[in-house]
């Protein structure tokens, strides 16, 4: 240092020694360091030894004059001199060639420099306070470096007693803790025995605070390595003003407060649904784009939202966490358990506004509402058939037996399957259908959970929606073939219907009434097809007892007659009259299309007429006697002339089934006169069901195609049959029973 060299030159001259306070104190500091090194028996620092040797003469000259007065000051600051030497040692550990890390030399600190603990002599120089404050500052930096070194400890290449390990218990904690990586490199170790004399005894006690051992640095890393000012900031300083909940970030508090205020600033531009968070809106938009970016790693199934995927992953767990307290069933999802618990009660909160039917789940109500959307009619198209009801003299029991639109047990689809078959379904077939319904329900129920309500209608197409898509893509050519096949299928079922009529006499129907979703005493959960047959009582009237409106009069014609008698002279000629079917049009000449209106009190008498024991009347072709009126057109009849029952049954929601096409000779009345007379009244449940929605062109007087029209109008050789359509699809089941739920 310049001060040291100047002091040595002045003292080496041998002249009068000028007492200088600062050089003398530095000389005393260096002398004390040399004495401590000699007491331990090791060598001092090379720089310190050089400086001690260079200033030896000045030390001797200065100590002769005023050595006693300066020994007292040296004893006071011996502790601080030891600390300063320790700081110099730490600075020498890093070495001058590699620049020290910037984090080890940060001047900004969360600690305030502490004034020296010893009392300062009054009137002393201010340099003493500056040196003391600098020593405290360096002490703080040294503690930071020691804490950083303790945090970066790793197992060095040397053993426990190798050269890379510092003296135990002095700098880096216990003896088993290895040194930091930068102390175990090649070359002489800076912590070796000859590198630095660690002060023993009182010097070590002065280096560390009282009460803490030399291994205290490992506990100071968290507090010393924090950024300035972080220790004073609270961990959660953002508090909700509604519920006093604390948050670490202001954005989290903002989102939380929106749950109290119900603020939803992010809305979907497609459906208008609003959300509190922007990421929720982003996940929602995947529903409209039909993208499923979140894939399950187990089964590969895709989901629109990440939280839905998280719920799905529970399905792959070996153990079901949610268990029913009533029947001990377990479920992977809590929403499924909640739905299952409703089966143990009669709570059905969702009610249909059209028919009053109640459901346990909202998704079941939505699916049921689609049946009303198919059969909706305007108020102007409503046909009141109250007079017809009075003519039938219905009893109170029959009026209470309602015909539900979606009741599969009484639906004509059920009777259609029975009339074409030879007997009841076997028990194994019924169990197979039950298991299939349970599997279909599991697939559809997976999308109905509490986490994603908007996804349950717009996700994958359900199994129950497939027949509806069939209707949308129905081709006109397929429809024409289906109509042709329908007529032949009806004619072919005549023999089966007559064979069943003998066996049905004397039997009494059981379990009459509607199949509600889960009424008291019932056995099914919701709209579930049942395998039981409903047979009519022997006392019920047959086809001949049906009231005939005055507009349609049937009378007998001799078998040899060429055709029906002509109409009165004043009657207008019927338009679109088909030669082969002269009895199929009403008096006004327009084809009658039934109104989609449901009567719920005419079910049991009308749908089972084919099973009564009354023989059919003689096969005579009926004709229509028109009643000409010049003032107004004739009124619309209450039921279709080509139906054996009122047309209200046409409003029952039905899916068009493609039936196998017959050969043409079955439809030709010339080849089979018995089938061409009045076979349409022998199975009215089939005929009224299929003819009410879309009457075939053969029955409306319109030729379905060139080949079929020519075959029915002229006598000639039979033409090749149209291509055979695929077999009919099974009846649509839209519900599941409690037995299926318990069996899953």
Swiss-Prot record:
Q: Where in the cell is it found?
A: Nucleus
Consequence of substituting residue 609 to P: In bowl5; embryonic lethal
Ranges annotated as biased composition (Gly residues)? 53-64
* Compositional bias ranges of the Acidic residues kind: 391-403, 442-458, 468-482
User: Matching SMART domains, A to Z?
Assistant: ZnF_C2H2 (SM00355)
Cellular component (GO) terms are: nucleus
In residue numbers, the zinc fingers (C2H2-type) are 238-260, 266-288, 294-316, 322-344, 350-372
Q: Has the keyword Magnesium been applied to this entry?
A: no
Protein name, as recorded = Protein bowel
Print the organism lineage.
Eukaryota, Metazoa, Ecdysozoa, Arthropoda, Hexapoda
| Gene (UniProt) | bowl
